[in-house]
């Protein structure tokens, strides 16, 4: 399966301006029910800001979220997937770089953010489907279509 099969077409990526405060970024994450934002400067992607950045770079360091700018605590994009990458490749990037989120970039534009939870859920569903097919086959239901 390819990454483009997981990309949500109707979803727009939630972003925060590089000059915004951490407080503003956290408010944006809360109101949009996301745990990561793309940090932009004049529509150019500069990095990512996540709950992990908040915990380790702001709260653990006793910084004031209202006075701390996102640009001071954001993380660089160390890896990205393209829509035509396989899910296995995307999972490998997440594991190799010890990430929880992976930007999906198409033509230089972040079109979605995949979470490791989404990928593991997909893998779990595929394994469950395969297991059901195998059980049906072993149980004598030879008419059950085998997975492709």
Whereabouts are the PLM-identified features?
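Tandem CBS (Bateman) regulatory domains
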Residues: 1-12, 50-80, 86-95, 116-148
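The conserved cystathionine-beta-synthase
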Residues: 15-33, 40, 80-98, 105
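A glycine-centered beta-loop-beta connector
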Residues: 29-32, 37-53, 94, 102-119
């Amino acid at each position: 399966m390819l990454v483009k099969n997981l990309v949500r077409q109707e979803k727009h990526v939630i972003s925060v301006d590089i000059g915004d405060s951490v407080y503003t970024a956290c408010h944006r994450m809360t109101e949009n029910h996301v745990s990561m934002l793309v940090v932009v400067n004049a529509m150019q992607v500069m990095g990512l800001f996540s709950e992990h950045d908040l915990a380790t770079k702001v709260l653990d360091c006793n910084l004031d979220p209202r006075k701390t700018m996102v640009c001071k605590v954001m993380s660089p994009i160390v890896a990205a997937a393209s829509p035509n990458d396989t899910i296995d490749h995307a999972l490998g990037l997440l594991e190799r770089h010890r990430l929880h989120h992976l930007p999906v970039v198409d033509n230089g534009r972040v079109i979605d953010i995949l979470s490791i939870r989404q990928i593991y859920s997909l893998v779990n569903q595929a394994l469950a489907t395969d297991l059901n097919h195998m059980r049906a086959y072993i149980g004598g239901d030879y008419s059950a279509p085998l997975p492709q």
